[in-house]
Amino acid sequence: MTIKKIISKNDPLISILSSPLRQDLATHFLFPRELLAKFPARKDTNPRKFCLLPLEGKNHLHNKHVSLYCLLSDRYLQPPSKRIFKRWNMELNNLNCPDIKRYILESLQDSLLKEISSLKETSTQNHLHCNDIKILQDCLRRPNISNGGIWVQWNLEEINQLKKFLSFRKLYPRQSFISLLQILPEPFLKSQLSHTLPVGSKYFFVPCDKKHHTLGLLLWKLFFLKDMPAAYSS
């Protein structure tokens, strides 16, 4: 199967590898350069063009579900991506961050396999895994909580456990929600996001140890900002 055919099927990992962000991935050692070199960059007439999930008209993986782990689950990846996913696991091992590896590759992936029976949204699933809050609670109870972590797009109006979550936010006011201004440069926010996204929009933050901050921020950027201008890459 050619690269073109793979990309046309919206394989999420191939899309990342073939995007301008692949150089950033190599810089952060999440993908080896020799692997990234096998995939051509997408050429875009507008280098500043990007899109923010969810995307209307796309399938389940790109539309309503808030968990970035949908994009990492090898259940939905084609064989070429599964091999890349295996190598990505190796790269995470090399980062010597066992907590973040376990969190990404085991906890919510288990939730994903149990809760998503197909690519079609169901009325009972809404936009929240049943295990998400429990896992997040376990994470926040760790004594070494800091400002590092993983960003997940979140829509409060869609949460089916709102009361529980609001009490959760009250307990951790600084670690539950953080404004976009705190993670994106203000010039970029004003020039690129102002017409698309209100400044006050919120993104759910899964805190981790301080040493994971770069990894968490990179994951947020990869899955929620597509084709981000190189000038604003961290």
UniProtKB/Swiss-Prot annotation:
One of its GO terms (biological process) is mitochondrial tRNA 5'-end processing. Keywords: Cytoplasm, Nucleus. Signal peptide: none annotated. It comes from the Eukaryota. It is found in: Cytoplasm; Nucleus. Coiled coil: none annotated. Its main location: cytoplasm. GO terms for cellular component: mitochondrion; nucleus. This is Protein rgg8. The gene is rgg8.
